[in-house]
């Protein structure tokens, strides 16, 4: 019994080692796809799983779903490969694929992953691809491919027609325009960069689902071979409607020539014609010219067996006469949707800015009108206040004559300004009368008088707005007789003295008039002081009182 158990154990170990060795020697299959790993929706795809001779069963599965493989059995003739068809590609077909096979009941390892990308999933916004400085680049220099879209994709990817060149970049969104872009810098340029390029957009969470492609952009590399010549027989300055033909020729036997307009995208290529003199040439007929035909042109030569073009010809400028077009925008009906959207957005932005500016302007005008009206009302109120002062009331008088407002222009021409300021003094017995000449800039030659009594507590000044000379003379005569001024000064019940200043001329004369004696022959406590300017009133102050 013990011997039987040992024999069975040895047999099992031997079979296990043999199976392990057999599995290790089964090579990995190779998985391929046609027409390409990047396909558009609704297209047909064929997967090929290949291995060495003798496989009996092949299986294909998508990563993430290994339990539901698609398997094909090869009988009665085992072969090297098997085909798996997908008649119509849908977005859910995108992903990573593997295949494996079986020989004598043993399974091989999985093939390397094959990524299938489905394009055309997002078609709501078209992408645009452009190149700087031009689609024809001199060998050894750099160029920049610019991919832009209104959709906020996470990444843009740039591909060549054979998908041998693939590069992806994160998008950069421009807030004012709402566009996203990516700049692909390429260089130094070689002949391997010649070809047709496209760009796509996709999101990070679905990297195998791409947008519709941009329009194809052809890139050509110009080399160091001899440049051709570009000529025109119609001249450089043309009228609209003239039929224009450009001729490109060279003494090198180029197989074809290409014509490129600087700043454009399209490149015209024609087969060259050999002349008896050994020149190669071709004609590019541009048809009847219009304003968009004007610009700068260059031509290149190329051989059929080389993807590299010659050096650029000297530039040829074509000018079109006629009136200058004020607007270069195409009609709205002929704009593509993306350009129409940009145009509408720009128009809305300009309109909003204009309305905001108009609102601010109206606000400023209304505010200034309100301030002017408020100032005018204040001036009228001030005039009314000045006119409402009763006789004998104190009216504040400004020293600045230029700022005084008069209610009656006729009276203003008859009166002369009088300025009097009365200040308290520290001493109780002193009386001062200060006079000074008017400023040189005063056109009316006004005279100022400042009277400073010692015990003044309150000042009452009566200054008429317009006073005739007869009235002034009467006032002075009364002042000489001591009937009015002295009576008011002696009979005042309040503890204050009243001082009067009368100015009626440009010459200041100062006098002290003694008040009349009382019945007992006693003088009052303090005399009154008079100051007068009187050229027209010489008798206002008695001569015996002058100093």
Curated annotation (Swiss-Prot):
Predominant cellular place of this UniProt entry's protein: membrane
UniProt keyword Transmembrane helix, yes or no? yes
- Location of motif ITIM motif 3 in this chain is 498-503
Q: Where is this motif: ITIM motif 2?
A: 446-451
Which sequence ranges are listed under topological domain Extracellular?
24-345
Protein localization: Cell membrane
Put simply, this protein is called: Neutrophil immunoglobulin-like receptor 1
């Amino acid at each position: 019994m013990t011997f039987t158990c040992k024999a069975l154990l040895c047999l099992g170990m031997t079979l296990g080692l043999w199976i392990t060795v057999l599995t290790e020697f089964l090579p990995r299959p190779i998985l391929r796809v046609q027409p390409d790993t990047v396909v558009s929706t609704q297209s047909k795809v064929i997967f090929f799983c290949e291995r060495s001779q003798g496989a009996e069963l092949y299986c294909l599965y998508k990563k993430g779903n290994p339990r539901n493989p698609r398997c094909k059995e090869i009988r009665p003739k085992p072969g090297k490969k098997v085909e798996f068809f997908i008649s119509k590609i849908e977005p859910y077909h995108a992903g990573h694929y593997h295949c494996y096979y079986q020989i004598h009941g043993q399974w091989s390892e999985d093939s390397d992953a094959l990524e299938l990308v489905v394009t055309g999933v997002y078609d709501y916004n078209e992408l645009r691809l452009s190149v700087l400085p031009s689609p024809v680049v001199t060998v050894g220099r750099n160029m920049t491919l610019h991919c832009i879209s209104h959709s906020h994709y996470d990444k843009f990817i740039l591909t060549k027609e054979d998908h041998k060149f693939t590069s992806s970049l994160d998008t950069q969104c421009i807030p004012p325009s709402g566009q996203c872009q990516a700049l692909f810098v390429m260089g130094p340029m070689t002949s391997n960069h010649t070809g047709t390029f496209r760009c796509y957009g996709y999101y990070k969470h679905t990297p195998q689902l791409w947008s519709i492609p941009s329009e194809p952009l052809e890139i050509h590399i110009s080399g160091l071979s001899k440049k051709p010549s570009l000529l025109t027989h119609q001249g450089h300055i043309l009228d609209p409607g003239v039929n224009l033909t450009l001729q490109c020729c060279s003494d090198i036997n180029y197989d074809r020539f290409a014509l490129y307009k600087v700043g454009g995208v399209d490149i015209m290529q024609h087969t060259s014609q050999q002349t008896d003199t050994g020149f190669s040439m071709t004609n590019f007929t541009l048809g009847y010219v219009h304003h968009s035909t004007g610009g700068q042109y260059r031509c290149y030569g190329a051989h059929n067996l080389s993807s590299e073009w010659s050096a650029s010809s000297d530039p040829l400028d074509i000018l079109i006469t006629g009136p200058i077009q004020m607007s270069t925008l195409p009609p709205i009906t002929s704009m593509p949707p993306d350009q129409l959207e940009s145009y509408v957005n720009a128009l809305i932005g300009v309109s909003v800015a204009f309305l905001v500016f108009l609102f601010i302007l109206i606000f400023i005008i209304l505010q200034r009108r309100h301030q002017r009206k408020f100032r005018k009302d204040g001036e009228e109120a001030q005039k009314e206040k000045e006119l409402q002062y009763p006789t004998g009331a104190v009216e504040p008088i400004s020293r600045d004559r230029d700022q005084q407002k008069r209610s009656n222009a006729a009276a203003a021409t008859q009166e002369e300004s009088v300025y009097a300021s009365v200040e308290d003094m520290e001493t109780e017995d002193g009386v001062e009368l200060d006079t000074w000449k008017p400023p040189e800039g005063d056109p009316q030659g006004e005279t100022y008088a400042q009277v400073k009594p010692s015990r003044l507590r309150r000042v009452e000044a009566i200054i008429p707005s317009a006073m005739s000379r007869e009235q002034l003379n009467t006032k002075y005569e009364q002042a000489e007789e001591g009937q009015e001024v002295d009576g008011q000064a002696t009979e005042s019940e309040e503890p204050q003295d009243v001082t009067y200043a009368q100015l009626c001329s440009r010459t200041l004369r100062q006098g002290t008039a003694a008040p009349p004696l009382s019945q007992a022959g006693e003088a009052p406590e303090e005399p009154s002081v008079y100051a007068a300017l009187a050229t027209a009133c010489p008798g206002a102050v008695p001569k015996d009182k002058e100093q």
